[in-house]
Amino acid sequence: MLKGKMLSALPELLKMDDGTPVTDRESWRARRGELLKTVIDMEYGGMPPEPKTLRVEELSLTPPGGINCYRIVADGYPFYLRIYKPSLPFRPPYPAVLYGDGCWKYMNDAFIAEVNRRGFALAVFDRLELASDVKDSGRSAGIYALYPEREFGALSAWAWGYLRAMDALEKISFIDASRVGITGHSRGGKTVLLAGAVDERFAFVNPNNSGAGGCGCYRFHTESDTPGGGGEMRSETLRDLLNNFDFWFGREMQKYADDEASLPFDQHMMKALMAPRVLLQTEALNDIWANSKGTYLTHEAAKAVYRLLGAENNIILRYREGNHRHDLNALSAFLDCMEGKTLADNTPEWVKSI
């Protein structure tokens, strides 16, 4: 049995910092600007700047059904992009799924085949080429060395990789850059939530099992009397995150490590920054660490912005049975969204009642 505790009310989403109500698209754009400044700077340490130079080098070109390889060089820093193209009868320009989790085991033949079978290109890079995922590895490597005066964390560095990969996709003629969706798992899911928030070119955003610092809720904690799929007995907290992965975040988050109730933001604000674009959150019911009820609470709160913009059907929360992984169930749901199918929330009543 799960039980939950709400530490404090979620901060106001549809009020400006000075208390002025947000009532229409114009005032939402102003509020969006406030949130980008407050949340991105505090939670993530800001973002790396847009590069002054960027070039895309073709390393290999193939016919339909093949793999094209590219080197992206941003301000002199290189990383690599592979594009798996669908076979005939699909013809370019292809919509594309952009996936920065080239470092995960989930990027396998079945994953590629499912994307291509539906007529999409799959563009893959390894976010670890941008910044290390090892605690205490320092800031002398990766893109930290490009911008030593900046204080962004690893999540921002990885999200920057998505932005630069999107720059590349816009230059590649067989990609339909107006129909690019991004997905990632766990810390990769946190990454795509950030990338989707700061860059409106991404038409579809899918964080999978992203938990605390992703689609969860800092203010809501869950405890269980039986272990979850990973043996966990409770949801992850900000203290847990900062003890193990402080380098993912901005330094200011340390102030709130044991006082999440006082955070001036929560993850409903990150979700709202996607509006009115499609945001599909995919979660696993036995993934207690990822805080399924917290995800539901911030989802429901973010709906207010989607409703204001006349796009309530574009924010979706889908649960599946199982544990912490990126499976074909979640991928298929995301491709359904990208094909324009309407998916409904499927939050179980027992999750709502925690």
Regions found by a protein language model. Give the residues of each.
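Primarily recognizes the serine-hydrolase "nucleophile elbow" in alpha/beta-hydrolase
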Residues: 163-232, 259-260
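Short, solvent-exposed loop/turn and secondary-structure capping segments
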Residues: 81, 94, 108-112, 133-137, ...
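Mobile cap/lid helix-loop segments that gate and shape the active-site cleft of serine hydrolases
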Residues: 207-270, 291, 295-299, 307-312
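Alpha/beta-hydrolase-fold serine-hydrolase catalytic core, especially in secreted/extracellular enzymes
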Residues: 1-80, 85-92, 107, 200, ...
